[in-house]
Amino acid sequence: MIKRQKLKYKWMLITTLITFTTILLFCLIIIFFLKDTLRSSEIDEAERSSNDIANLFHSKSLSDISALDLNASLENFQEILIYDDKGRKLIQTSNDNTLAYDNKIDFKHPERIHIQRSHGINYLVITEPIRSKDFSGYSVLVHSLQNYDNLVKSLYIVALAFGLIATIITAGVSYIFSSQITKPIVTMSNKMNQIRRDGFQNKLELTTNYEETDNLIDTFNEMMYQIEESFNQQRQFVEDASHELRTPLQIIQGHLNLIQRWGKKDPAVLEESLNISIEEVNRITKLVEELLLLTKDRVNHNVLECENVDVNSEIQSRVKSLQHLHPDYTFETHLATKPIQLKINRHQFEQLLLIFIDNAMKYDTEHKHIKIVTQLKNKMIMIDITDHGMGIPKADLEFIFDRFYRVDKSRARSQGGNGLGLSIAEKIVQLNGGMIQVESELQKYTTFKISFPVLN
């Protein structure tokens, strides 16, 4: 199992390593170029001295050249050795008696410029042949690289020290900066744990100096609001469903008890109890079907077969059927002169019409006059269904699409409603890209305005 690390320590470690590596590479590159430049300078200085010695032998004979003449051509930390053709050392002199070069020279295969190490010190050695009127031999210039090596070593030490100091500073700054970044995250984590303990009523009420964390806080609060709303709806749904199921089950239980006591001997009691029980079972079945319909999501809607439905024809068909079933009701229709096509599942549209018309009939038992209007307006299909019944109080308008909500609770059961019809209708409208508006005045009228976008 991978051990989890704190974000601020991980951030500090990563930034410190990157900084140290970058500085180290930068210093190494600089040292590389400095070494090359300094080494070229050392070689140039040694070659100048070697050339001066060669010119001295060309201008004077060996017997006229003194050690002082040779030393005048040398720089500090240089030594000159003169050999004859047989490799015998004739002259050895320098301006610095501390030089400790005593390596042998291979005159059979001499390298003009090479580096040799003697007594722990590197030397640049330049071997030049000397050909003059009275002398033939070799000059060997020994140039100490001790200062060069010490300088390069110092550069490495300075680079390492600079890298370490920069790393320590970076680590400190990184720690402070990462602490500032992770502080709101830690606060959010603590708040989330508090919300987990105390419930959804708490929200993250803090702001930071960073847009990303502020957006995260806003998103979290929005998510918590949706979760709380969903949780409350679920709890209300369970409570309401339990309440709605309790009454028919109690009725069925009561009539079964009647059958058990007297129904076996009294056919009238048996018949009445069975009819009422069947009616309540049908009510429960309808309630369960409506609950299942409400739990279906948009994915289920997408797999439904949609077709171009003639809105006016469907309304006329539904009105004709209802007119036969309810001859005491008057259905007034004002339909658009042009055909109106709506892409929707036909069964859903039929169910939508039945819900609104049935709802209008339930709450208009006095005038029994239902008005249906269709029109095309602003690229929208408008369907208005109006009844002249009891109306809806303004305080109830925002709740009428909630599950199990009834405006007239005393009459709802006798009218056979479960309080789910408008919730189902709203869902059908929303799933098909439409919207619903309600206008109502108490004891006068209620109009449901359903609108859908026109097909392209």
UniProtKB/Swiss-Prot annotation:
Record's protein name: Signal transduction histidine-protein kinase ArlS
InterPro entries, per database record: ArlS_N, Bact_Sensor_His_Kinase, HAMP_dom, HATPase_C_sf, His_kinase_dom, HisK_dim/P_dom, HisK_dim/P_sf, Sig_transdc_His_kin-like_C
Stated role: Member of the two-component regulatory system ArlS/ArlR. ArlS probably functions as a sensor protein kinase which is autophosphorylated at a histidine residue and transfers its phosphate group to ArlR.
Main location: membrane
Pfam families: ArlS_N, HATPase_c, HisKA
Keyword field: ATP-binding, Cell membrane, Kinase, Membrane, Nucleotide-binding, Phosphoprotein, Transferase, Transmembrane, Transmembrane helix, Two-component regulatory system
Gene Ontology molecular function: ATP binding; phosphorelay sensor kinase activity
Subcellular location: Cell membrane
Originating organism: Staphylococcus epidermidis (strain ATCC 12228 / FDA PCI 1200)
Residue span(s) of domain Histidine kinase: 240-456
HAMP domain: residues covered: 179-232
PTM info: Autophosphorylated.
Modified residues (Phosphohistidine): 243
GO cellular component: plasma membrane
Superkingdom as given in the UniProt entry: Bacteria
Classification via CDD domains: HATPase, HisKA
Catalytic activity: ATP + protein L-histidine = ADP + protein N-phospho-L-histidine
Membrane topology, as annotated: Multi-pass membrane protein
Enzyme class per UniProt: transferase
